[in-house]
Swiss-Prot record:
Family in the record: Belongs to the argininosuccinate synthase family. Type 1 subfamily.
UniProtKB keywords: Amino-acid biosynthesis, Arginine biosynthesis, ATP-binding, Cytoplasm, Ligase, Nucleotide-binding
A GO CC term assigned to this protein in UniProt: cytoplasm
Gene Ontology molecular function, alphabetical: argininosuccinate synthase activity; ATP binding
HAMAP family xrefs: Arg_succ_synth_type1 (MF_00005)
Quaternary data: Homotetramer.
Gene (UniProt): argG
Pfam hit, one: Arginosuc_synth
Pathway stated in the Swiss-Prot or TrEMBL entry: Amino-acid biosynthesis; L-arginine biosynthesis; L-arginine from L-ornithine and carbamoyl phosphate: step 2/3
Signal peptide extent: none
Main localization of the protein described in the UniProt heading: cytoplasm
The protein's name: Argininosuccinate synthase
Binding positions for L-citrulline per the UniProt entry: Y86, N122, R126, S174, S183, E259, Y271
Amino acid sequence: MAKEKIVLAYSGGLDTSVAIQWLVESGYEVIACCLDVGEGKNLDFIKEKAITVGASESYTIDAKEEFAEDFALIALQAHAYYEGKYPLISALSRPLIAKKLVEVARQEGASAIAHGCTGKGNDQVRFEVAIHALAPDLKVVSPVRDWKWSREEEINYAKEHNIPVPIDLDNPFSIDQNLWGRSNECGVLENPWTTPPEAAYDLTVSLEDAPDTPDIVEITFDAGIPISLNGENMSLANLILTLNEIAGKHGVGRIDHIENRLVGIKSREVYECPAAVTLITAHKELEDLTFVREVAHFKPIIEQKISETIYNGLWFSPLTEALVAFLKSTQKFVNGTIRVKLFKGHAIVEGRKSPNSLYDENLATYTSSDTFDQDAAVGFIKLWGLPTKVSAEVNSKVTITTEV
């Protein structure tokens, strides 16, 4: 009798390597699936390791461009910062990983999907809600959450089954990375009073070590999409990765955040997102130049809600679909180039230009070339202030008394 097939989201680390053997012992035929979303994984090594540990098949997928174009771009155009700080690094990759897991499951005829998330984090929610949205018929298994082992028990299990134990197990931090940034938690970071050590950072340098000379970059957008950096056309993934290096060496994008998790607990997170911060800053500036006032004032409401739905694992929900539709409808005229100075942790916009600019220098100037009709202001003020004036006239006739 053929074994039930299960597709495992495989990272190559201890948790998911142990999960392969545990699932095999539980009677499954395990198919491993690993994505590269810009963290620089050695896919060949991971593919081979999955087979060595016990998987019958191992898929490795280079998903950098898809992640950039279909997920990171939405976060960029939404200026997405959960709670005003977190640019949704891990939250963005989970729906793409879930999508690929479902695709592999369909291709292999699998009846279940497994992930390596714990029962305390947000990722278990993101994976399972996404999988159920895409494939309601598939069963979801969570070995790490189910077995409730300690780290020591996992290591002992790995040694008993000749599973290679990663050499970095003494690393005190829990790290997740993709091209949109790097997240870090655990270890000394669990004390919110502790200053993050430099060992917690990888994409950025400290302000003390940042160069004393800034870098000036020019980012060109077409319909809200970054298409070139300093005049060189690039794919979106390559542009983000290149900007991570340039902005990172100036210490741009360090974020230290106390975060309200979906599961109800607070966590202390340290993020590095040099490209994300720089691109969002530039994109927002271009919108300011090209948006009419009403759209500029309303869009932040949509941005906040998109940030929440993505963080909460609702990427494939009807609400997110509707919010993204509005978002995309605003980007048609977001065309132009933004000049940004990167210096000592800051991304500072110093210039902007657009063929769709709504800024009219002749209207804005106070020089003799002014074309603004100041006489029109009298009638505008009268009508604009009319409700306030009427209210004041009516209420000034009313005597308010207070009896004790």
